[in-house]
């Protein structure tokens, strides 16, 4: 893997050096090391480990943040993909935006949480009959994944938290080599306000129109591929609203960042089909319309698991 340019490396270093310190860093590192050690020593040898990123990052406008710019993402794809990876035998580091969709919770009712419960008497509480099946399944699946040591959930909110945590995960996964995967489904901000240039306190609304100069977020994919975890299998995503430019931009991303595949999805059809763009050609992956419960992630993860298997075999020969 060729090294990244000095200019890009300087931009990345500058971003991290000027970022606010990551809270609970020592605890995060300890949890990651414990998780990886557990899945490295399981019966049958090393278990495959995937980092799934999910949800959108925020860009604070003040250091004591009241206002922010948001990259919206429900996190549904990341949550659904995590479930499928666990089903395929992977251990999953789920790096997710606080408040977004969680694994095993996609089929829970949209009603407010408290409406799922009822009081049969003064001393007991139980799940309402109409919701009992979904709640039971969600709790059982979630607890099984955690009890088996195959799901570690790490939350973020800001672009600063996300990128610092991604770097931590990648550098710790470096020793896992080809058995590790990155599935980068998070909606990451392209622009941000540098920490040292933003005001500390709430921006006053009475001072007239607000002009903000946004800097470009350094592209971390290049350094993830070349330095942080060069042997990991890496999948990135490209979302566009214009289908005419989608495949062209996905192909450019594939070539520029040297990832193993780019999942191209168009905003209006993203739940029905995606295109997996790779050096071996493009593959259209669709939801199985004959199965009402089917989601596109079922077939997408199945394809990527097969690709990862091939990659591991080739890496060991």
Swiss-Prot record:
Pfam families: DFP. It comes from the Eukaryota. It is an enzyme of class 6 (ligase). One of its GO terms (molecular function) is phosphopantothenate--cysteine ligase activity. The keyword Ligase applies. Keywords: Coenzyme A biosynthesis, Ligase. Its EC number is 6.3.2.51. Pathway: Cofactor biosynthesis; coenzyme A biosynthesis; CoA from (R)-pantothenate: step 2/5. Disulfide bonds: none annotated. InterPro entries: CoaB-like_sf, DNA/pantothenate-metab_flavo_C. One of its GO terms (biological process) is coenzyme A biosynthetic process. The keyword Ligase applies. It catalyses: (R)-4'-phosphopantothenate + L-cysteine + ATP = N-[(R)-4-phosphopantothenoyl]-L-cysteine + AMP + diphosphate + H(+). Signal peptide: none annotated. Homodimer. Belongs to the PPC synthetase family. Catalyzes the first step in the biosynthesis of coenzyme A from vitamin B5/pantothenate, where cysteine is conjugated to 4'-phosphopantothenate to form 4-phosphopantothenoylcysteine. The catalytic activity is not CTP- but ATP-dependent. This is Phosphopantothenate--cysteine ligase 1. It comes from Arabidopsis thaliana (Mouse-ear cress). The lineage of its organism: Eukaryota, Viridiplantae, Streptophyta, Embryophyta, Tracheophyta. The gene is PPCS1.
């Amino acid at each position: 893997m060729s090294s990244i340019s000095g200019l890009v490396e300087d931009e990345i270093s500058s971003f991290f050096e000027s970022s606010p310190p990551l809270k609970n860093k020592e605890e995060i590192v300890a949890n990651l090391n414990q998780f990886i050690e557990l899945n490295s020593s399981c019966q049958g040898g090393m278990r495959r480990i995937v980092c799934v990123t999910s949800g959108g990052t925020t860009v604070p406008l003040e250091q004591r943040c009241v206002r922010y710019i948001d990259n919206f993402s429900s996190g549904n794809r990341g949550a659904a993909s995590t479930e499928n990876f666990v089903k395929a035998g992977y251990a999953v580091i789920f790096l997710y935006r606080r408040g977004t969709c969680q694994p095993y919770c996609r089929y829970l009712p949209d009603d407010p949480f408290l409406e799922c419960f009822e009081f049969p008497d003064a001393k007991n509480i139980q799940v309402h009959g109409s919701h009992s099946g979904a709640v039971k399944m969600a709790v059982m699946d979630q607890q099984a994944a955690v009890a088996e040591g195959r799901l570690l959930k790490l939350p973020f909110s800001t672009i600063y938290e996300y990128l610092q945590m991604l770097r931590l995960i990648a550098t710790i996964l470096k020793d896992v080599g080809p058995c590790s995967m990155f599935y980068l489904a998070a909606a990451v901000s392209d622009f941000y306000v540098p920490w040292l240039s933003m005001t500390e306190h709430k921006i006053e609304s009475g001072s007239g129109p607000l002009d903000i100069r946004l800097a470009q977020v350094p592209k971390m994919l290049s350094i993830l591929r070349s330095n942080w975890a060069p042997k990991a299998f890496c999948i990135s995503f490209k979302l566009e609203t214009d289908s005419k430019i989608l495949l062209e931009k996905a192909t450019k991303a594939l070539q520029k960042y040297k990832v193993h595949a780019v999942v191209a999805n168009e905003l209006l059809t993203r739940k029905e089909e995606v295109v997996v763009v790779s050096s071996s050609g493009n593959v259209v992956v669709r939801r199985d319309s004959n199965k009402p419960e089917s989601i596109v992630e079922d077939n997408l993860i199945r394809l990527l698991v097969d690709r990862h298997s091939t990659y591991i075999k080739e890496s060991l020969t």
